[in-house]
Amino acid sequence: MPHPHNKKIQSFWLITGIIFIAFNLRPAITSVGPVISSIRAELHMSNGAAGFLTALPLLSFAVLSPLAPKLGQRLGNERTLWLGLVILLIGVLTRSTGYTAALFFGTALIGVGIAIGNVLLPSLIKHKYPEKPGIMISLYTTSMNIFAALASGVSVPLATQMNGGWKQAFLLWGGLALLALLIWIPQLRHRDTANQTMKLQSSSIWASKMAWYVTIFMGLQSFLFYSSIAWFPEILRSHGIDTATAGWMVSLMQFASLPSTFLTPVLADRVKQQRGIVAALASVYLIGLCGLLAGGSHTLLAIWMIIIGIGQGSSISLALTLIGLRSENAQQAAALSGMSQSFGYLLAAVGPIFVGYLFDQTHSWTMPIVLLIAALIVMGAAGQGAGRDRYIFQSEKQRNSA
């Protein structure tokens, strides 16, 4: 039996490692939106091509998410997460060379690395902290959103002040990945989350109605998040806001999401059904999007961004919390995480591309914002199904007899 002091040290490094992996799951993506106009001008891209660049990590998520649980079973979640960080670092270095082909290839690699973390961290948390997944999901999602917000805010100032422009600004996030790699090294000797003790028929989860509710909720909240990260800076610029300020306003949106990001999983963990939480966050989100559609002064636009951020923070943290709440064990959590983030991110990948395409066709941001509102309404409906007190493989009869 490990000495209590050693156990505390191991727990410290595990929690620190989870936090630093979470730090890396968004900045390489959210740093792109504020400087997309500079990239587009330098590399002569259309809005559609720029939208595809933003969607590329999501396509990587969609392809890799079903494979990540299987890789975790083979290598262990700890080693697979470390491998994901290595791939992320290589992607950041490749993208920062500035060549068009390298930009797209590096971005795809970044998506592969992040996909592994996206899928396996909820499973690892479910395994390591089965009695208190809510607080750990809060810690994980809040850490993720802090650096997502920071990356949005500092991208333009860094690109402006550095000789290498946006290329050198992107390179800085490689240092964060390297730091996480080093911190996670103590976990490499563990394989206890390799999920070898139980077999789960991967095909069965696709027949679960509850799994589909969670997947659609996950997919549409991602659709909304990544569309906003990609195009809100441009929407704000259309209201007369300069590029740097637009970047900081998107950053403000993400910082505003932090309280709801942290509190939502804790609250969701304490109630049997999460349908009321879904209704509340969807209502707040809707107010913000309708406000953005209406426009207004710079101050009013900042208020709409804050309101959107509150809804956004709740939706991402609740989506991740539902993976654990609707699963009976770590194996089910890994399978549900893989499904929801595969089909879900495939759906999300359509967002930035289609929003860019709609703007190219209409030369107005009205229809793209209306599309986001429609996606939010469907997300709320799926959330009502996902918020019921039921496991993914639990029938109504089993639930009533429990």
From Swiss-Prot:
Its main location: membrane. One of its GO terms (cellular component) is plasma membrane. Induction: Negatively regulated by TnrA under nitrogen-limited conditions. InterPro entries: CynX-like, MFS, MFS_Cyanate_Porter, MFS_dom, MFS_trans_sf. Disulfide bonds: none annotated. One of its GO terms (molecular function) is transmembrane transporter activity. The keyword Iron-sulfur does not apply. The chain crosses the membrane at residues 12-32, 48-68, 80-100, 101-121, 134-154, 168-188, 212-232, 248-268, 291-311, 339-359, 367-387. It is found in: Cell membrane. It is a multi-pass membrane protein. CDD domains: MFS_NIMT_CynX_like. Keywords: Cell membrane, Membrane, Transmembrane, Transmembrane helix, Transport. The keyword Lipoprotein does not apply. Belongs to the major facilitator superfamily. Cyanate porter (TC 2.A.1.17) family. PANTHER family: 2-NITROIMIDAZOLE TRANSPORTER, PTHR23523. This is Uncharacterized transporter YycB. It comes from Bacillus subtilis (strain 168).
